[in-house]
C-alpha cells in the first residue's frame, strides 16, 4: 500500500521544477486546479494532459511512477464515473433496460469528472514530489501571513499541513504492517468479491486509528517537551527568494487558460 500511494512523498532531485520557489508552485497548482474546473471539453483535457506531461518530464518524474500513484484512488474514480453514468440524463438515449437508462451526457460527464479528479490528484502529487514538506510549509506560511492580522492562526495551520503530509506515508506503512499481521492470522483481504474485500478491510480500521492516535500523542508530547509554541514568531533557516523564473511560471497560466477555454468554446 505504501509503495502505491505517492502523494505526500518528496523526490530530492535537482531539476528546474524542484528549484522553483515553493510559493510559485503553490500558486500555480491552485490556479491550475481552477482551470481544470472551468474546462468542459475533451480537447481541453487533452491540452491540460500535455501540460502535465511536460511538467512531469521537466521534473524527471517517471510517468509510470506518477500513474501508479492513482491506483489507490482508482476505485473512487470508477465509482464517480458510474454515478454520473446512471444519474446524469440528457442527450441520446443509448441503453434502456427497465428502470436503468444510460444517456450520452452521462458517459460524457462521467469521463470528464473522472479526468478532472485524476488531473487534480496528479498535479497535487507533482507538487509534493518536487517540494519538500518544510518548504511547502514555509510557502503556505508566507502566502497566508496577512491572515494573521484577522486572528487566523496561519503558523498553526502550516504546521498541521506539514504534519499531515508527513503522516500519509507513515500511516500507509502502518497499514501494511497491520495487513501482514492479519494475513499471518489467516485473514484473507485480497481475494473474493468486492463486498467481501470491503468487509474484510473494515477490521483493519480500528488498529489503524489507534496507531494514528498513539503517534499523534507521541508527536504532541515531543513538540511540547521541545518548547514548541504555535503563537510564537518564527524564523526560517532557508530564505525564500522570488526570481524571474517564478514570475514566468505564473504568467504561463495565461496561455494555458486561454487555450483551454478556446478549445472548450470552439470544439
Residue ranges of predicted features:
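Alpha-helical transmembrane segments and their helix-start/interface "positive-inside/aromatic belt" motifs
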Residues: 25, 62-74, 249
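Alpha-helical membrane-interface segments at transmembrane helix boundaries
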Residues: 63-67, 71, 108-112, 202
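Transmembrane helix-loop junctions in multipass membrane proteins, especially transporters and channels
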Residues: 41, 45, 60-64, 88-96, ...
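Juxtamembrane/interface alpha-helical elements of multi-pass membrane proteins
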Residues: 73-187
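Loop-to-transmembrane-helix entry motif
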Residues: 69-77, 114, 118, 208, ...
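Transmembrane alpha-helix interface motif
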Residues: 1-42, 48-57, 142-145, 149-152, ...
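Membrane-helix interfacial "entry" motifs
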Residues: 14, 37, 60-65, 97, ...
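Alpha-helical transmembrane segments and their membrane-interface exit regions
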Residues: 51-61, 75-79
